[in-house]
């Protein structure tokens, strides 16, 4: 569809089964309570398998032992993933100590996983520990509400901007947006926190009785850092400051990376500029975007239900006009803004009020005590003495924020003694993977377990061509749902089958261009052979300051994706 020939505002047809499930769930209650008390299975059955996602959990099993258990006539080893709601990634040291203890005492893997949704996940929670984890979170002022399924997910906010004062203001807006768009149902409190049922009827004035057509992701971003990868998200508020003070936001809508292998109706898409709005209209505009997508999003086909598809179907101007109508405003022209990078600034950075921030590189966000590198113990020891907070970044790293000068040496010593400040090359700092095997049920190929050794080999190629300190934004995602954000990388690997990936090239360093598929269904040796040749050319032929992705486009190695709805698959 073009802007001149927009499609229908509402897609008619038989609703997907997920819509039935939501409608019949009694505002997300289902029969979860009954399932919790069923000791015959380690999992949740029927609709509850999906309903628990609205409560921040996914049912998984250990795929490494799935076949072995099947041979023994045993059900899969079911366990839950829980994702915390943590707007802007800010967590207190008291909260950190509580989650550290829970991970050690009550999860199969004993780890804390930082994610690129700027929060943490527990993997391997047995059914008997599901209620206790929600109660533990509640006891320290946290929850897992609306971190999965068809709601506004965890709201991201730039972690380590150049203006600390601006971060404080932007972070407050991230929290306000998150709270404003939360579901109003009391199901979460009743089921997990044993709060009494109230006689009043549930209402969902913003999300509606069947919630959103699909997942919905929101960011608050402070230029020039695009660390939160705004183009992966449905709704983005780009902070505009005057004299160091936040005055309003540019709004960008309709980003999203998930695709389905071979389904040409799916595509990755960057977000579109709508306009500028003063601060006082922020919540009204956020609500208007969400309710427009609620009413116009495709509820017949979940593969085509995200905001990016709604925007393409009805046309950008039509969607924008509806948001203006609902919010009661007219967007002003976009204010100037520019992004220069999206990696974290590893190491010490000076903030305001003589406070320091220490960004620690955590490979794939996995916090665990490794032989010779007791990362988890180190962070616990820092949490015990640190007077500021921790910030999780959208690059799966951790910031020890607001460290006074008097504590700096002590915290650095703890970090170094526990392997948290080991030297890594720029390539490793700019590489990322989703979890994938063994816990993700959707995984088609390895990602987190594949990345460290693969990065070693890419570093060797950079060294071979005389550019050991260069970096290429590299992402590995275990399936086309794209949690690893490979569709905004300069080198993106998308899992196709065990040991096989689609290789995408042509993204850029700042994350504003979708990469195109260069080779399909290839093995690691084939990938490395291609990269060896292309990185060799980049080292010799690049212009000053030219990133690898920009080089592959300029040199004609790959055609840029300019209009994803039409040319993503070409």
UniProtKB/Swiss-Prot annotation:
GO terms for molecular function: 4 iron, 4 sulfur cluster binding; heme binding; metal ion binding; NADP binding; sulfite reductase (ferredoxin) activity; sulfite reductase (NADPH) activity. Keywords: 4Fe-4S, Amino-acid biosynthesis, Cysteine biosynthesis, Heme, Iron, Iron-sulfur, Metal-binding, NADP, Oxidoreductase. [4Fe-4S] cluster binds at residues 434, 440, 479, 483. It is an enzyme of class 1 (oxidoreductase). The keyword NADP applies. GO terms for biological process: cysteine biosynthetic process; hydrogen sulfide biosynthetic process; sulfate assimilation. InterPro entries: CysI, NiRdtase/SiRdtase_haem-b_fer, Nit/Sulf_reduc_fer-like_dom_sf, NO2/SO3_Rdtase_4Fe4S_dom, NO2/SO3_Rdtase_4Fe4S_prot, NO2/SO3_Rdtase_4Fe4S_sf, NO2/SO3_Rdtase_FeS/sirohaem_BS. Signal peptide: none annotated. Its EC number is 1.8.1.2. One of its GO terms (cellular component) is sulfite reductase complex (NADPH). Binds 1 siroheme per subunit. Its cofactor is siroheme; [4Fe-4S] cluster. It comes from the Bacteria. Pathway: Sulfur metabolism; hydrogen sulfide biosynthesis; hydrogen sulfide from sulfite (NADPH route): step 1/1. Belongs to the nitrite and sulfite reductase 4Fe-4S domain family. Component of the sulfite reductase complex that catalyzes the 6-electron reduction of sulfite to sulfide. This is one of several activities required for the biosynthesis of L-cysteine from sulfate. This is Sulfite reductase [NADPH] hemoprotein beta-component. It comes from Salmonella agona (strain SL483). The gene is cysI.
